């Protein structure tokens, strides 16, 4: 069988070049291209890297690597889940690799976790090539819906305790998930006291976008805060989240629920109650911009 070629791979190196981070590129050494297809919505590439395990790339942008995915998946999930007193019904928008689902079902209080992703190809290929992440799909509490998250949400009012939006960047199929009408849909789909997290880009590269995101969220939710995590294979090594609550008295910066240290170390490789608090502490330049 001939080797699979892809325009982002030259001389054995994958190059991630995007208008969203001009003048810089992330490169990973490729051991073998495992799969490439054009789905209905995006270009899907999966390759085995020499040092980061299998890598999922959508529209030429790294979504996850097996080496560092846990930082993102754990933080976007547990910042929301542990800011809610008793999350029983959880919705994941996007997240077709299954990583967020894997984290959601670590909480015994969860009775149902629904995932809605627009692209069946991401779900199908993650099950094939990212087994440690897609393990979440096999859990008995999980239901999967393939479709547009925006349209899916319109059918739900006062239904979910936590909604996690694990989207790609605001270009292509995920663009609408960064706009105010979407946050209103999230708000309306939550029960009283409900919490959301949503992927919210990078303080080094996207401060104007984050400033607008926070403003939009504040107009919809009484509580809206920006947190971030470190992750080596995302642009400039960080990614942020908006964490919002319908409860005006909520303090999402401090976990309402926490595991014992022993449980934490068993369940998580990145998240802990201390890092929950620390993730909201921003460097001066970002803090000033977001005030």
UniProtKB/Swiss-Prot annotation:
Pfam families: Spermine_synt_N, Spermine_synth. Keywords: Spermidine biosynthesis, Transferase. Putrescine binds at residues 72, 166-169, 234. One of its GO terms (molecular function) is spermidine synthase activity. One of its GO terms (biological process) is spermidine biosynthetic process. S-adenosyl 3-(methylsulfanyl)propylamine binds at residues 42, 73, 97, 117, 148-149, 166. Its EC number is 2.5.1.16. Pathway: Amine and polyamine biosynthesis; spermidine biosynthesis; spermidine from putrescine: step 1/1. The keyword Iron does not apply. GO terms for cellular component: cytosol. PANTHER family: SPERMIDINE SYNTHASE, SPERMIDINE/SPERMINE SYNTHASE. This is Spermidine synthase. It comes from Neurospora crassa (strain ATCC 24698 / 74-OR23-1A / CBS 708.71 / DSM 1257 / FGSC 987).
């Amino acid at each position: 069988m001939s080797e699979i070629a892809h325009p982002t791979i030259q001389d054995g190196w994958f190059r991630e070049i995007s208008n969203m981070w001009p003048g810089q590129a992330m490169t990973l050494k490729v051991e073998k291209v495992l799969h490439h297809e054009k789905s209905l919505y995006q270009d899907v590439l999966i390759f085995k890297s020499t040092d980061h395990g299998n890598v999922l790339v959508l529209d030429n942008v790294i979504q996850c690597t097996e080496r560092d995915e846990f930082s993102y998946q754990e933080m976007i999930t547990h910042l929301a889940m542990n800011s809610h007193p008793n999350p029983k019904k959880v919705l994941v928008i996007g997240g077709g690799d299954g990583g967020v689902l894997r984290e959601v079902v670590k909480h015994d209080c969860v009775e149902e976790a629904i995932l809605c992703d627009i692209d069946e190809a991401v779900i199908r290929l993650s099950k094939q090539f990212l087994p440690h992440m897609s393990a979440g799909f096999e859990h008995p509490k999980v239901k999967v819906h393939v479709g547009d998250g925006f349209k899916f949400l319109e059918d739900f009012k006062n239904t979910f305790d936590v909604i996690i939006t694990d989207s790609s960047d605001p270009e292509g199929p995920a663009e609408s998930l960064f706009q105010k009408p979407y946050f209103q849909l999230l708000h309306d789909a939550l029960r009283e006291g409900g919490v959301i997290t949503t992927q919210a880009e990078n303080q080094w590269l996207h401060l104007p976008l984050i400033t607008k995101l926070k403003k939009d969220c504040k107009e919809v939710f009484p509580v809206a805060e920006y947190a971030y995590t470190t992750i080596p294979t995302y642009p400039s090594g960080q990614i942020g989240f908006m964490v919002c609550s319908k409860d005006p008295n909520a303090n999402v910066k401090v976990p309402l629920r926490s595991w014992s240290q022993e449980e934490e170390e068993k369940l998580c490789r990145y998240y802990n109650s201390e890092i929950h608090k620390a993730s909201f502490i921003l460097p001066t330049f970002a803090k000033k911009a977001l005030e």
